[in-house]
């Protein structure tokens, strides 16, 4: 159970000693592509404390990105979950992850986010000839921009999971890109 009073105290101490506050909560529901009520509640609390950036972990899948107003007039960027950077899980959406790209500027106005994005990552795995585990022994994380149909088709996409195929991967990446675009629009970046 989250101790809100203790967390508020820790955030306040951090704000007093720094120009920009980032929180990395372990939250959410595993494999849920959306957010849950506890994440929404905690995000509202973090915004009320003046947090600048939230990068969530735990669900193993990419969840929405949001850019919200704080009660103090500032803004808070939330990556609810970036999913897995690299994964040997066999659930469909766990093989796509995200890498946050955030530009923070500090000047006479203070420190603030001036740009952000997310690059989709793809975990590709295959056998290299020598089986050393029950899993694949060559695991590569590709940026979406470098992953191709040829790479996917030459590997073990989905490891036999019929629900995870190249078409599903393209659909999921398009949904992730749309969420990033929407958050960037809210921030006035597009």
Give the role of each language-model region.
Residues 1-190:
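Acidic, metal/ion-coordinating pockets
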